[in-house]
Design a protein with these regions (language model features):
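Extracytoplasmic ligand-binding site segments that recognize negatively charged/polar headgroups
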Residues: 1-42
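A bilobed periplasmic-binding-protein/Venus flytrap-type ligand-binding module shared by bacterial periplasmic
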Residues: 4-7, 75-88, 106-107
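Periplasmic-binding protein-like
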Residues: 16-20, 27-28, 59-83, 97-120
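Short, hydrophobic alpha-helical packing/hinge segments within bilobed ligand-binding/sensory domains
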Residues: 34-35, 52-53, 91, 103
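A ligand-binding cleft/hinge motif common to bilobed small-molecule-binding domains
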Residues: 44-62
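Substrate/cofactor-recognition hotspot
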Residues: 94
Length: 163
């Protein structure tokens, strides 16, 4: 989402700087730290993933989450069969199983993630995919922007007051 938001803003550098400033230059190292800080009251707002926020909600926490107006990205989980696999038929059967409606439902519920199937509804409390402000950027543009975002974020993390 950071990359998509950066692409949707006038200046990626200014966007990162303002975000870091709003976070008091405190950069946590994991979504678990964000969740813990929200639950114990250290933070009233946290920047995290949809799955992490949904985990809090499904666990009964009184939290909500939003997506950046500038946009976000949806990177779906993937499964593959290795070329030259000595057990190709079994691997393809497992692939079919992982993509089945039942398996996708189990994964969505147990991991608070979205199904890769378009015919499987989002879990309770999650917005349908068509309502998300998804970036229209391609993978090459997103990859380049991610590298820039990482560099700018490291610079912001090293500024006065950084964690």
């Amino acid at each position: 989402a950071l990359v998509a938001a950066m692409l949707g803003s006038q200046s990626g550098e200014a966007y990162i700087e303002k975000l870091a400033e709003n976070l008091n230059y405190e950069v946590l190292k994991s979504v678990e730290q964000v969740n813990e800080g929200i639950l114990d009251g250290r933070y009233s707002v946290g920047v995290t993933t949809e799955a992490a926020a949904q985990t809090l909600r499904s666990g009964g926490a009184d939290v909500d989450y939003i997506y950046p107006e500038e946009g976000t990205v949806a990177v779906l989980d993937g499964t593959a069969v290795r070329a030259g696999s000595s057990h190709k038929e079994e691997a393809l059967a497992f692939l079919d199983f992982t993509l089945s409606r039942d398996a996708q439902k189990i994964m969505a519920v147990s991991r608070n993630r979205r199904s890769v199937r378009m015919d499987t509804a989002a879990e309770k409390g999650m917005d349908p995919m068509e309502k998300l402000p998804l970036s229209e950027a391609g993978w090459a543009e997103l990859s380049e922007a991610k590298q820039q975002a990482d560099m700018l974020w490291q610079q912001a993390d090293g500024r006065e007051g950084g964690a």
